[in-house]
């Protein structure tokens, strides 16, 4: 299985860019906005969504050596959920690994488990995937949770860039609609 190195590098860079955005966001928040559930949005906290994002990255990176990534084996580390310092440290560590891991540049088949269905057949096995496919999954998953973080933070009255939590394809679509209207 091969992927052009430039494509693989672009996927890594995209994920690093999302994580740097998360790092800037965490640095801009106070503890209340980061760790408190807005009224009526339980259990949604910015910190809980960020913890979830980071645990997916950890599962992916930790599973590369064995070629078995188990997204269901998340640690659910509450420290990251409530501590901006712990979240920042985890983000920096993941960025470093993404930027330096040789495994990420060697496309190959990997096996992935993620329980998305209430079926014993799904729970028991791993599905075939690839490094580039999982990098794409991580990117999409991150943007999806950024959108939920944006809702949570805006409920707290936090000002965010209007494009925070929007997928690149959505931003391109909106830009094309704006260009058409002009």
Per-region residue spans from a language model:
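Carboxylate-rich helix-loop segments that flank metal/cofactor sites and access channels
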Residues: 103-123
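Preference for long, well-ordered alpha-helical segments
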Residues: 134-135, 141, 145-179
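Amphipathic, well-ordered alpha-helical segments in soluble domains
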Residues: 18-28, 56, 90, 145-148
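A short, structured beta-strand/loop element
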Residues: 56-63
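Extreme N-terminal tail/first-helix region
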Residues: 1-23
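Alpha-helical scaffold segments that form or flank carboxylate-/histidine-based iron centers
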Residues: 6-11, 34-55, 73-89, 124-141, ...
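Helix-adjacent hinge/juxtasegments
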Residues: 67-108
